[in-house]
């Protein structure tokens, strides 16, 4: 069974591992750098940019896969799924138009407005800097609301800036908004939204064009440093719980979040056609219930590393059900286990990361700790590993409870030597208690 995988990060390493649990799978991967974890699982690798559509076509024509799985967002944005579907290859990953739920923040917000989907917020989109932006921000200030400045296109999770975190106040938000246009960050178009106050969580679904099957809820940690301090990153780690919920969210609130995602899928279908693939909703649990921060048209990274290792159902079967519109005929199960994922990242990440420095990884010690190792933005050359400037590698601890899973992950994360750092507090009971207390305060 030939499977084409596009992408070379830790998320794709998790996808590759999950696929290879089926002994029939022969994996063929197109990726930019030599990720040693994915390379070891692949029959053949094409080293090309994941947005190089002619290279994707050439590789697919050569290997003739029976199904394709697209990992990152960038190939979705250039129509990789459209190409593969046109070639007659069942594909897991939305086509270019449905993928706008991630690639165009304006499309996402307009969809919520048009179809009156719950969980929306006050926002405005702008094509240039001028009086309109300043007036909108001034209006938000008069309402007592801080703002979030979001480049409208893809920025790898690092273009968003929030007042009270990366920005001092709404006046500084104006300065950053001008910078987005001056530097054409994320395509040189922006969304300015009201800042949501609450606790973040993520919810994933398998989507087959009509049906959505939900996965366990996960909490990501986007801030670079312990205690949720520092700049926003692509995600420093995450955890999930044995009951598939989270300690600070009720079943009712989780159900409301699921209904928001269900209506989103239906609205995408009505607006631009069927959505097939993985859908990731990033939510803020506020005093008014769950609100959507943004959607991703693929697995979250790091969340894929929490979810896929505890998937009991054959992942290849799930992929075919997505591609063929048959999710309603499947009973998809996850183990009732806790997971904790922690990332090592280059010193200086995400602002000014060191690059092309050697990273020593004690793989045996990580295995002995009981953790799973996932390679991310790593390049292997002549038997040595080099960091490339983005997140380097992740470890995942899995156990009956969060406390034990965190201990496994922490023991494992100490087995990297190089110019890297990590957050030691992810999955700890102290940090989780802070989340619970924050939600209690919201309810008052």
UniProtKB/Swiss-Prot annotation:
ATP binds at residues 140-202. Its cofactor is Mg(2+); Mn(2+). GO terms for molecular function: ATP binding; metal ion binding; phosphoribosylamine-glycine ligase activity. Mg(2+) 1 binds at residues 282, 294. Pathway: Purine metabolism; IMP biosynthesis via de novo pathway; N(1)-(5-phospho-D-ribosyl)glycinamide from 5-phospho-alpha-D-ribose 1-diphosphate: step 2/2. Binds 2 magnesium or manganese ions per subunit. Its EC number is 6.3.4.13. InterPro entries: ATP-grasp (IPR011761), ATP_grasp_subdomain_1 (IPR013815), PreATP-grasp_dom_sf (IPR016185), PRibGlycinamid_synth_ATP-grasp (IPR020561), PRibGlycinamide_synth (IPR000115), PRibGlycinamide_synth_C-dom (IPR020560), PRibGlycinamide_synth_C_sf (IPR037123), PRibGlycinamide_synth_CS (IPR020559). Mn(2+) 1 binds at residues 282, 294. Coiled coil: none annotated. GO terms for biological process: 'de novo' IMP biosynthetic process; purine nucleobase biosynthetic process. Mg(2+) 2 binds at residues 294, 296. Residues 109-324 form the ATP-grasp domain. Mn(2+) 2 binds at residues 294, 296. It catalyses: 5-phospho-beta-D-ribosylamine + glycine + ATP = N(1)-(5-phospho-beta-D-ribosyl)glycinamide + ADP + phosphate + H(+). Keywords: ATP-binding, Ligase, Magnesium, Manganese, Metal-binding, Nucleotide-binding, Purine biosynthesis. SMART domains: GARS_A (SM01209), GARS_C (SM01210). Belongs to the GARS family. This is Phosphoribosylamine--glycine ligase. It comes from Methanococcus maripaludis (strain C7 / ATCC BAA-1331).
